[in-house]
Every structure is written in C-alpha cells, then in structure tokens.
C-alpha cells in the first residue's frame, strides 16, 4: 500500500485580531491571505503561499486545510510518495486537488503534474487508500 507524505500541512497560528493577510508564517517563509475566524486563524476561503513554492488555495477551518482545495508543490519543492522503493518518486510541479479534513487529504483527489492529470487517488486521514490512472480521452481518427 502506498502512503502520501504531504509536506507539513498542519497550520498553527497565534495571530492577534482578525485580518485579511496573516504574516506569522514569515519565519517559515509562508503567508496567508484570506478569511479569518474570530480566533484569528484562517477560516473560510484563502490562499497560503510559501517561498519554497508550496501553496494551497481553498477552504480553511481553525487554521487547517479543510474542505475543497488545491495543494501545489512548484519546481522548488518536492512531494514524496512512500514507501520508498523503485516506485518511489520525488514529484515536482505537482498539484493535488480534492478534499481536506483537519489538515489532511481525505476523499477523492486528482494529482496533476504541469497541468496534466497523472493519477486519481482516494485518501483517508492523509493516507492513500486507492490509486488509479486517469482515463485517457478518446483520440479522434479519420
């Protein structure tokens, strides 16, 4: 069984006041811009971006990815597929689109690389439970 080790997704915040842009991530090279709850943590729609190229656009709840969203690792970052074996890979320019629950991948996801779907997966509590190749579109022949 394969596991997806998403780069640290849990977002811990200690921000004062409600604001649209939160910078406590600066020490980690990340910035959040979006809706904020009464507790000062991201809640609702927002964008989280890091200097190393990681980003998340989607829903947040209590400072964590929660709901529909897209997590992207640019050419500067890496996403690892485990366990490490001949099938393991460091994936760059990957986007994982789907549902998150309490900061972890949960539900159906499409993994794309450079805009092309690479595989479809089902996750449960951050663990990959099922992986399928995307269906190829029928080519037109004359």
What positions do the PLM features span?
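Sec-dependent N-terminal signal peptides
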Residues: 4-13
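Glycine/tyrosine- and acidic-biased, solvent-exposed loop/turn segments at the edges of beta-strands
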Residues: 14-142
């Amino acid at each position: 069984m394969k596991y997806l080790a998403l780069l640290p997704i849990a977002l811990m915040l200690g921000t004062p006041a409600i604001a649209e842009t939160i910078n406590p991530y600066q020490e980690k090279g990340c910035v959040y811009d979006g809706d904020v709850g009464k507790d000062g943590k991201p809640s609702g729609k927002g964008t989280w971006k890091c200097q190393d190229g990681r980003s998340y656009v989607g829903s947040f709840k209590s400072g964590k990815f929660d709901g529909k969203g897209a997590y992207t690792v640019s050419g500067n970052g890496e996403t690892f597929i485990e366990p490490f074996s001949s099938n393991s890979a460091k994936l760059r320019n990957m986007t994982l689109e789907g549902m998150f629950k309490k900061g972890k991948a949960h539900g159906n996801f499409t993994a794309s690389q450079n805009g092309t779907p690479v595989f479809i997966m089902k996750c449960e509590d951050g663990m990959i439970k099922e992986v399928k190749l995307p269906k190829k579109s029928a080519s037109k022949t004359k």
